[in-house]
């Protein structure tokens, strides 16, 4: 259900702005998106797992707040990020 350390390092390399960047909003959104996708796969076979569903909603809300922050500060970076992550625009 959680992502591996190798996958997390791969996401950090892909979305980092500088070499030692591990906490920028783009990196955080990428990691949250990976966790959300893993939980979505989990629910295909465990549809009664309501506790994890609550965790999923918390992760989606956290990602939405980060994306709103990026959208407010840099619209072009926001559009680039959502296209790379494969998610829809926030209304």
From Swiss-Prot:
GO biological processes: translation
SMART domains with a match to the protein in the record: Ribosomal_S15
Family: Belongs to the universal ribosomal protein uS15 family.
Name listed for the protein in its UniProt record: Small ribosomal subunit protein uS15
Quaternary state and interactors: Part of the 30S ribosomal subunit. Forms a bridge to the 50S subunit in the 70S ribosome, contacting the 23S rRNA.
Function: One of the primary rRNA binding proteins, it binds directly to 16S rRNA where it helps nucleate assembly of the platform of the 30S subunit by binding and bridging several RNA helices of the 16S rRNA.
GO molecular function, one term: rRNA binding
A GO-annotated cellular component: cytosolic small ribosomal subunit
Any Pfam family matching the protein: Ribosomal_S15
Organism of provenance: Rickettsia prowazekii (strain Madrid E)
Gene3D superfamilies, A to Z: 6.10.250.3130, S15/NS1, RNA-binding
Entry keyword set: Ribonucleoprotein, Ribosomal protein, RNA-binding, rRNA-binding
């Amino acid at each position: 259900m959680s992502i591996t350390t190798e996958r997390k390092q791969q996401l950090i390399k892909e979305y980092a702005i500088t070499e030692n960047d591990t906490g920028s909003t783009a990196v955080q959104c990428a990691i949250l998106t990976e966790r959300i996708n893993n939980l979505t796969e989990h629910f295909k076979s465990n549809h009664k797992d309501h506790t994890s569903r609550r965790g999923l909603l918390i992760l989606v809300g956290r990602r939405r707040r980060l994306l709103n922050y990026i959208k407010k500060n840099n619209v072009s970076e926001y559009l680039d990020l959502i296209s790379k992550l494969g998610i829809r625009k926030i209304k």
